[in-house]
Amino acid sequence: MLGQEIYVNPARGRQYNPDDFAGILQKYEADVKVQYLIKNMDIQYPLTVIRTKLKEAFVSWENLDSFITGLTNSLYNGMYIDEFKWTKALVSSAYKNNMVNVETVSSPLTSVDLAKAFTVKARELFLNFQMPTTSYNAWSKVGGSGRPITTWTAPEDIVILIRNDVRAYMDVEVLANAFQIDKAVLLGNIYPVDSFDVYSDEGEKIFDGSNIFGMIADRNWFKIKPVDQFMENGYNANNRAMQYFLNNIKMYEFSLFANAVVFATTEATVNPTAFKFLVNGEEKTSITITKATDVEVVTTPYSANASITYASSAEGKATVAKKSGANKVITITPVADGSANITATVGEVTGTLAVTVDV
């Protein structure tokens, strides 16, 4: 663990009561939230330079030194490219794991359509981000404890990531007027990207980010912190080679507290790996019911959003149904004395709640 981000929710006011003398003896705790962050980038860029071999290919020391400088610069170029990829991957990761709010625009649409839709909705979000709201951070979305947090963003801290094929159809002049912000300031807060795909070190695509075409966020959503960066080198006299090692150690995380909305043509589907059942906030593996009872179904991860199928092993004893269409709240209704197992299933993952009916 590298550190933590601490957020203190705004205090809630109360109506003044001149007769409340006992209130001075109560404890009023601040609503403090904590997100733990880790160092997750530790990359080394190696390079071997054998000067005697290089000298054979050059007619002057000046050309040789210039070439060696180009070789060492390649280490930094590789590092900067990786940092660009890691930054884009933050957006892809948050979207893929359903840990960020998503604004969907129905497809199929052309880049022109996406640009128009983005401009209109981004204008609305640009204004809403500046108001105290619980709607655009991901704290509750990922199962953060306590009440939802209230956040807001200064207009100069709102940044936009946009895919190049969509950005090409966006008129920055119109956008600046719509946002009521200086064009130069807006341009400084727009970051065009080629795509939100994620690739392995071998160049294999490991995440298809074609559904994502943009993002509007508080710049503090990006938790990118340098830990250490240094160059080391050593000379190997045995083969007259100089070894260079550029080390880059950083933290690449995203904040659950900051406002952020991803624009995509569809939401990502996250499957659960486990279920648990809560009745009045307490985890249960078995319950006894005498009347219709609501049960909260909590998934691992909490942000899993795949549609859950519920079933009763004995509908003559108890039935189960999603409450008001909610995916993770069910109502178990008694039918006759006896027992039944209520199951929650997604794919091959199943959770079971044993129910005893006593009517």
Predicted regions and their residues:
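Extended, solvent-exposed, turn-rich assembly/linker loops in the middle of proteins
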Residues: 98-195
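Assembly/oligomerization interface modules of large self-assembling protein complexes
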Residues: 1-47
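Extracytoplasmic soluble-region selector
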Residues: 270-359
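Long, contiguous amphipathic alpha-helices that act as assembly "spine/axial" helices in icosahedral shell
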Residues: 33-103, 242-247
